[in-house]
């Protein structure tokens, strides 16, 4: 039987998540709190950690590159990230995504996959 990985939202209440994101932003104002989780059907390994403090001026492309290296993906394997079921432009800055898509708990939620389409 496979290990069931609970999502970040299932592990912590909305109040706990809001308190944590507020603490992170107060302590690291130049960074944004990002939760990245594997799309359920993705043929990829789970990451050891799913919570990242990302520089506000980092591009989505740089973030994807960092995730690929962290997962030690074969360079021939493409990695895609989604925000609210949308594939963001790789040139987009993370702070722009955060300002547009952050959730009420103060985190930006993303998922990753090897497929370019969601669903």
UniProtKB/Swiss-Prot annotation:
Cytoplasm among keywords: yes
SUPFAM superfamilies: Ubiquitin-like (SSF54236)
Post-translational modification: Gly-119 forms then a thioester bond with the 'Cys-558' of ATG7 (E1-like activating enzyme) before being transferred to the 'Cys-258' of ATG3 (the specific E2 conjugating enzyme), in order to be finally amidated with phosphatidylethanolamine. This lipid modification anchors ATG8 to autophagosomes.
Compartments, as annotated in UniProt: Cytoplasmic vesicle, Autophagosome membrane; Vacuole membrane; Cytoplasm, Cytoskeleton
This protein's record includes keyword Nucleus: no
Phosphatidylethanolamine amidated glycine lipid sites: 119
Record keywords, A-Z: Autophagy, Cytoplasm, Cytoplasmic vesicle, Cytoskeleton, Lipoprotein, Membrane, Microtubule, Protein transport, Transport, Ubl conjugation pathway, Vacuole
Name of the protein this chain belongs to: Autophagy-related protein 8h
Organism: Arabidopsis thaliana (Mouse-ear cress)
């Amino acid at each position: 039987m496979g290990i069931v990985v609970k999502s970040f939202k299932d592990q912590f209440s909305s109040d706990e998540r809001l308190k944590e994101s507020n603490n992170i932003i107060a302590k690291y104002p130049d960074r944004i709190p990002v939760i990245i989780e594997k799309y359920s059907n993705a043929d990829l390994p789970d990451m050891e950690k799913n919570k990242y403090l990302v520089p506000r001026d980092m591009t989505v492309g740089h973030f994807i590159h960092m995730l690929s290296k962290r997962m030690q993906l074969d360079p021939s394997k493409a990695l895609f990230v989604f925000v609210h079921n949308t594939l963001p432009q790789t040139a987009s800055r993370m702070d722009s995504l955060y300002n547009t898509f952050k959730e009420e708990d103060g985190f930006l939620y993303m998922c990753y996959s090897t497929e370019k389409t969601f669903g």
